[in-house]
Amino acid sequence: MDGPRSDVGRWGGNPWQPPTTPSPEPEPEPEPERRSRRGGRSFWARCCGCCSCRNRADDDWGPEPHRDRGSGSGRRRPDSRGSDSRRPGSRASGVNAAGDGTIREGMLVVTGVDLLSSRSDQNRREHHTDEFEYDELIIRRGQPFHMVLHFSRPYESSDRVALELLIGNNPEVGKGTHVIIPVGKGGSGGWKAQVTKASGQNLNLRVHTSPNAIIGKFQFTVRTHSEAGEFQLPFDPHNEIYILFNPWCPEDIVYVDHEDWRQEYVLNESGRIYYGTEAQIGERTWNYGQFDHGVLDACLYILDRRGMPYGGRGDPVSVSRVISAMVNSLDDNGVLIGNWSGDYSRGTNPSAWVGSVEILLSYLRTGYSVPYGQCWVFAGVTTTVLRCLGLATRTVTNFNSAHDTDTSLTMDIYFDENMKPLEHLNHDSVWNFHVWNDCWMKRPDLPSGFDGWQVVDATPQETSSGIFCCGPCSVESIKNGLVYMKYDTPFIFAEVNSDKVYWQRQDDGSFKIVYVEEKAIGTLIVTKAVGSNMQDDVTHIYKHPEGSEAERKAVETAAAHGSKPNVYTNRDSAEDVALQVEAQDAVMGQDLTVSVVLTNRGSSTRTVKLHLYLSVTFYTGVTGPVFKESKKEVVLAPGATERVSMPVAYKEYRPQIVDQGSMLLNVSGHVKENGQVLAKQHTFRLRTPDLSLTLLGAAVVGQECEVQIVFKNPLPVTLTNVVFRLEGSGLQRPKILNVGDIGGNETVTLHQKFVPVRPGPRQLIASLDSPQLSQVHGVIQVDVAPAPGGGGFFSNAGGNSPLGETIPMASRGGA
């Protein structure tokens, strides 16, 4: 690939540096309202059936908006978790008349606005936004909502009323950032407002929004015109309106035609992320927390920090691409700093995170990139952001994921004449697993047939158009090897469906293909199943069945567009000895055994010279030095099978072990009789224990309850500086517990209290991290009963104790 490559994205974490991006400035105070004196028709003369008429005289539309009006996030974070009670609307004493500033008798003065924004009101329930821990109105585009206007006198048929929504620094009608909706008039573009009831001094409205509307936080105002004059309601932060994508709206290009999918991929606040190896799959629960207080503002702030034009924020293709760039910190001081070095002393070990909320709120609060993340953290945060904004999104794990660095669309491994790896040439790598995201949308920018799931990958691996982002890329184009479809299809295709090609240096210095491993990449692609915590194998949507004609055609079609289009020609095929690797399923701290099984499938005796090299490996495919090796010659009778075993003691691998507890067995061999080359790379991992969580008593909204956490140290050494994390949407805000040291093989018990703030089934998630042991986590489902009398309860969720609290052990025990 021609663009710059990131050592951070591939494996080497750079030390955390003091960020250069300053904290976001507070939202500026509103400028004094001023009336445009330029010529042209009056506001009401130019107010056609709908503001979407693209009138370009945007600076003549009455009082100018102040800077950062209704910005995508603003720096005013919601300051109340609130109850379901409504705030009083703006009263007459707080209004300003347009024009000379006086309120004349007979003028239609707006004395208040009720946006029906509480969680129990019709709007939030119908728009599936009632779980957001916000008091402001949150709606989804393309779907009507209701409001009530309160006037100083009864509304008359001769009165004219218009609603206005504004977003951005310089709202313009033509860009969709200044929306004007005349009440009672039909309009184009999907915006309109209808009177549903006029009663006394109240006017009930049903407002229709465009299915193509910009997403973000809009400021809202009302204008009126009567014979006595014109009036405009001043902007009020309480009347800000959030507009999101709408997968429930058939006219929205993010529409999803399966309610169970919408419940899972938009509304589910937790999920499972898979890791490890194909043969030893691990799973962890992740708290997405997209409805937690402050998270929506953090998601919109990400778009602001990127400087994304407001006019493009209605396009999910553009929004998802920006998010893929901004969730990592490279180029743009985004959310997370990647680190694969193993040294996390200046931040948080990526394995210690249990969810996205702590990360996003830290970024919103400080404006600084958060240390540290690896692929599953980038993907977990991306799922949170895209679900929060209204895109159906899932977290996907690809086992044996290739990282193609030269656009050959193959994984190339180079050996010398004796089949010893040439590390200075081996730039491609195969990750044990890699985690990315699928999000659902139509692709109007592509030919037909490429709608549906799109890959978005926020892990910084390679540049795309000069920045570290990836996607959205149609899964359909990946499946069929159509690598010329945007965005980043060649790189993603290679991750799931390239072949591992072994090259041997010849006597004249040239290289020859000696073996092609066709089923080594993208061997299993999984995500959490809809409606359950089971795995859902989605390999079939990414690739045709391995070995099928369609799959071979896809690979060869893709390779023809790569940098080595003739890689599939002139291959030798004398292969009658089969090789298989087996590794014992062992727990960290135990001894283990690895084995190679050789089978002679021919009719003649075969003599095999076998070499085994064992090293530790990061999950990204970057290996440490070989710490154990074995050489053996095996004679195989026709049809015979022989097993070659290599025991590995804990004391041998303990000094070498790295993150994820992964090891790589390199096997190479040579058959004397026919020259067949044997080559195999097998990765396996050591399992870590789980935390055991037990709920002590019933969980009720607003009432304190307690959880017990039990952990047994599997290692014979002391764990130092042990840190627990606890988090769960609707249960517990992110909490850090410092517990000190835990002795070798010791069992410890902690008790923690929390106050649930939302009813229903919830997930409470915990993790443990120390320099000696990581990737330890646990989860418990908590079924929360409503508070007596019903209703929501938002009061500093999980705020019982601060971050970084030192917690004494409830009990300690031996092995």
From Swiss-Prot:
It is found in: Membrane. The modification Phosphothreonine is found at T21. The keyword Lipoprotein applies. It is a lipid-anchor. Keywords: Acyltransferase, Calcium, Keratinization, Lipoprotein, Membrane, Metal-binding, Palmitate, Phosphoprotein, Transferase. Binds 1 Ca(2+) ion per subunit. The active site is at C375, H434, D457. Residues 59-87 have a biased composition (Basic and acidic residues). Palmitoylated. It catalyses: L-glutaminyl-[protein] + L-lysyl-[protein] = [protein]-L-lysyl-N(6)-5-L-glutamyl-[protein] + NH4(+). The modification Phosphoserine is found at S23, S80, S83, S90, S93. Its cofactor is Ca(2+). Pfam families: Transglut_C, Transglut_core, Transglut_N. InterPro entries: Ig-like_fold, Ig_E-set, Papain-like_cys_pep_sf, Transglutaminase, Transglutaminase-like, Transglutaminase-like_sf, Transglutaminase_animal, Transglutaminase_AS. Its EC number is 2.3.2.13. SUPFAM superfamilies: Cysteine proteinases, E set domains, Transglutaminase, two C-terminal domains. One of its GO terms (biological process) is positive regulation of keratinocyte proliferation. GO terms for cellular component: membrane. Interacts with PLAAT4. Belongs to the transglutaminase superfamily. Transglutaminase family. This is Protein-glutamine gamma-glutamyltransferase K.
